[in-house]
Design a protein with these regions (language model features):
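Glycine-enriched, solvent-exposed interface loops adjoining structured elements
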Residues: 1-227
Length: 227
């Protein structure tokens, strides 16, 4: 696991005087936003055994993460379809009282989901799920591979958030807007990679501008990226 603490040094030169704790919190928030919008942090959960008469199940995701979305699910080798709460009640009004072979799923919380119809038999390791994860609001770290692959996006996201804070010595709304655009570009790239549309992204940035003023640091950062 890679700690958010380890990324502070990449952000601090662009927000001089900013407390480490504030940078760390914004690194976490930026990572959560990147994960939610790109769905790039994917994970195959361990197979789940269903129980007859039980429709609610818990995710067994890695510690320090929440399940943002179920990307696909299979039951006994057959695909399940996602369903919204409204569609569930409209199309299966008495589903709690009926059992059968599940055909749809509904994610209720970051920790739980439902199967409908209610399973009518036990299926050992019969349920497979692929999910999009995101860091929890209290975690201090993120998967090392994800951090390495999307380091630029995480850093840009933290910088744009910090630069827009009003009344600080590092406040810089114009630079914040540009870093926001860089962050959005990284989200788009992450989404493409998450869908398998890219086999790799070359890192082009070196965070080496500690001796420059905030505006020059910002300008140099953009120049190195050729934006």
């Amino acid at each position: 696991m890679a700690s958010f603490e380890s990324l502070i040094k990449d952000v601090l030169p662009y927000v001089p005087g900013c407390p480490d704790s504030l940078i760390r919190n914004n690194l976490r928030s930026a990572t959560i936003e990147l994960c939610e919008k790109s769905k790039a942090y994917t994970y195959d959960l361990d197979p789940i055994t269903t129980i007859s008469g039980t429709y609610e199940y818990e995710f067994d995701q890695p510690s320090g993460t929440d399940v943002h979305q179920i990307l696909w699910a299979t039951y006994d080798g057959h695909d399940l379809d996602p369903i919204s709460p409204r569609s569930l009640e409209l199309n299966y009004p008495d589903w709690r009282d009926k059992s059968g072979t599940p055909t749809v799923f509904l994610q209720k919380t970051p920790d739980t989901f439902w199967l409908v119809p209610v399973p009518n038999s036990k299926k050992v390791n019969g349920l497979l799920l692929n999910v999009a994860l995101k860091p929890s609001r209290t975690t201090s770290s993120i998967d090392t591979n994800f951090s390495n692959d999307y380091r630029d996006g995480i850093v840009y996201g933290a910088i744009y958030r910090l630069l827009r804070i009003p009344g600080k010595e590092w406040t810089n709304p114009p630079a914040s807007a540009d870093y926001f655009n860089l962050f959005q570009n990284q989200i788009n790239d992450a989404e493409l990679r998450g869908r398998g549309g890219d086999t790799g992204v070359k890192r082009t940035v070196k965070y080496k501008s500690a001796g420059l003023s905030p505006r020059k640091r910002y300008g140099r950062y953009g120049k190195e990226l050729d934006y």
